[in-house]
Amino acid sequence: KPGMPKSLPCSAASNADPKSYATQPVETILTNIIGNKNILDYCVSHKEITKMILTSSFEVYGELNGQDIYSENMSGMIDQTILRNGYPESKRCCELLVRSYVEEFGINAVIARLPSVYGPTMLRSDSKAHAQFIRNALNGENIILKSKGDQRRTYCYVVDAASAIFKILSAGKNGEIYNISNEKSVASIAEVAKMCAEIAGTTVVFDLPDEIEEKGFSRSKNCILDNTKLRKLGWNGKFTLRDGLTETLAYLKDE
């Protein structure tokens, strides 16, 4: 495609679900940091690599008291005494490592901060709340909510996420960070549960989390990503949250 670099490594492999954060904290941290370093070293030694991208996470923002909308220059507190925070801390380290390689070795790299991405390609073992809601809905079961669900999040259908990543690769400025966010897909966890139940014709019920589930919970209240920088590159999301959830369930039912 015109405008796209020829060789495009993408640093994306990671434990990316709360259960893994709680039960495999060492693997989560090392996969992020060492895996990312290996890709960066490859970029340095292979001059045909024209650009690489790191897929980071909204979790790097930590807790920003009094802030609901997060732009790329913000940074909040992450409690290092909580094991599940090995994920956001290691993602922060990866971001700094990428920018350091850009400065010291002159590679061309960009960073994408992803929101809560969903779609039919999610792992069946994914323990994130919205992934569990989708599995419940797919099986015709009641949607189980294990908290008040009042935290508001930015969600993104996988098709929109993929197109945003390609836009950042093709048009993003070297060393810059870009939030991936679709303003049509902002909702509370409870609203996502209700939407899944409505699409599937089931009901939302409340249950207590078990010990491992509770250890994996994020402590941040609201996290709505500001997509101003990404929109300036010419990108806009196509899918509303309801449309994306409907497509996800329809696709999985046809498998």
Which ranges hold each PLM region?
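C-terminal substrate-binding subdomain of Rossmann-fold SDR/epimerase-dehydratase oxidoreductases
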Residues: A137-E255
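Short, solvent-exposed loop/turn segments at secondary-structure boundaries
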Residues: T23-Q24, T121-S125, S218-R219
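A short acidic, helix-capping loop that chelates divalent metal ions and anchors anionic groups
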Residues: P18-A22, G119-P120, E213-K215
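NAD(P)-dependent short-chain dehydrogenase/reductase
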Residues: L64-N73, L96-T154, V158-L169, I189, ...
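N-terminal Rossmann-like NAD(P)+-binding domain of SDR-like oxidoreductases, especially those catalyzing
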Residues: K1-P115, E247
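Asparagine-centered polar/low-complexity signal
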Residues: T31-N32, N36-N38, S116, N136, ...
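Residues that form or flank phosphate/diphosphate-binding pockets in enzymes
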Residues: A16, K47, G62, R124, ...
